[in-house]
C-alpha cells in the first residue's frame, strides 16, 4: 500500500480545483495548471480535501497512485506559493544575461549559447553568476534548469560549471608528477 498515496491533499484558501474524470485543473493566485492522468486511479474531492485512490490491485494502479498524489500536491503548492530554483555559475569569464525572451550564456565556448525562456518561467539575475528561476510548474522548472546545467555541467577538478546553489560537487585531486 502506498504511504504517499494514502495521505489526503488539503486545499488551501484561494485555490480552486476542477475535476473532470482524470483531468485535474487547479487555479490559484500564481496561475493555473492542468494535467490529465492515466492509469487505474480515481480522484475525488471531499470537504476541502483531494483524495487519490487506486481502482484495482494491479501494479500499474499502485504505481500511479503515489505518483499522481505527489504531482497534484506539487500543482497545489505551485499555484499557491510557486517554486524557486537558484543556479550558480562558477568559472573565470562565465556569466549569463537575459536579453528579451532568451537567456544568453557565456561559458568559455567559441560561441555564446542562447536558450529560449519558456513563457511560464521568470528569471531574475541579482549578479552575473547567479540565476534565479521562478515558476508554478515544478516539472517544467526542473527541466529548464537541467537544460541550463547541461550547457556546462560542473567538473570535479576545478569546480567550474553551472550547478544548483547548495549542490555538493565532489572534488578530485589533479595528477601528480
UniProtKB/Swiss-Prot annotation:
Entry annotated with the keyword Ribonucleoprotein: yes
Keyword rRNA-binding: yes
Gene Ontology MF terms: rRNA binding; structural constituent of ribosome
InterPro entries the record matches: Ribosomal_uL6-like, Ribosomal_uL6-like_a/b-dom_sf, Ribosomal_uL6_a/b-dom, Ribosomal_uL6_bac-type, Ribosomal_uL6_CS
Any one cellular-component term (Gene Ontology): ribonucleoprotein complex
A Gene Ontology biological process term: cytoplasmic translation
Origin superkingdom: Bacteria
Disulfide bonds: none
Keywords, comma-separated and alphabetical: Ribonucleoprotein, Ribosomal protein, RNA-binding, rRNA-binding
Subunit field text: Part of the 50S ribosomal subunit.
Protein purpose: This protein binds to the 23S rRNA, and is important in its secondary structure. It is located near the subunit interface in the base of the L7/L12 stalk, and near the tRNA binding site of the peptidyltransferase center.
NCBIfam families listed in its UniProt record: L6_bact
Similarity-based family: Belongs to the universal ribosomal protein uL6 family.
UniProt-recorded name of the protein: Large ribosomal subunit protein uL6
Organism: Rickettsia rickettsii (strain Sheila Smith)
Gene: rplF
Amino acid at each position: 500500500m502506498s504511504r504517499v498515496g494514502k495521505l489526503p491533499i488539503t486545499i488551501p484558501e484561494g485555490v480552486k480545483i476542477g475535476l473532470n474524470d482524470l483531468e485535474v485543473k487547479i487555479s490559484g493566485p500564481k496561475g493555473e495548471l492542468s494535467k490529465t492522468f492515466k492509469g487505474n486511479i480515481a480522484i475525488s474531492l471531499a470537504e476541502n480535501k483531494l483524495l487519490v485512490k487506486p481502482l484495482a490491485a494491479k501494479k500499474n494502479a499502485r504505481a500511479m497512485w503515489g505518483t499522481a498524489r505527489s504531482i497534484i500536491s506539487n500543482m497545489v503548492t505551485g499555484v499557491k506559493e510557486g517554486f524557486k530554483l537558484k543556479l550558480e555559475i562558477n568559472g573565470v569569464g562565465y556569466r549569463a544575461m537575459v536579453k528579451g525572451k532568451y537567456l544568453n550564456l557565456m561559458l568559455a565556448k567559441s560561441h555564446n549559447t542562447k536558450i529560449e525562456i519558456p513563457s511560464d518561467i521568470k528569471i531574475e539575475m541579482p549578479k552575473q553568476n547567479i540565476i534565479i528561476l521562478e515558476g508554478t510548474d515544478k516539472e517544467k522548472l526542473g527541466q529548464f534548469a537541467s537544460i541550463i546545467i547541461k550547457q556546462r555541467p560542473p567538473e570535479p577538478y576545478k569546480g567550474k560549471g553551472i550547478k544548483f546553489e547548495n549542490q555538493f560537487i565532489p572534488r578530485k585531486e589533479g595528477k601528480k608528477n
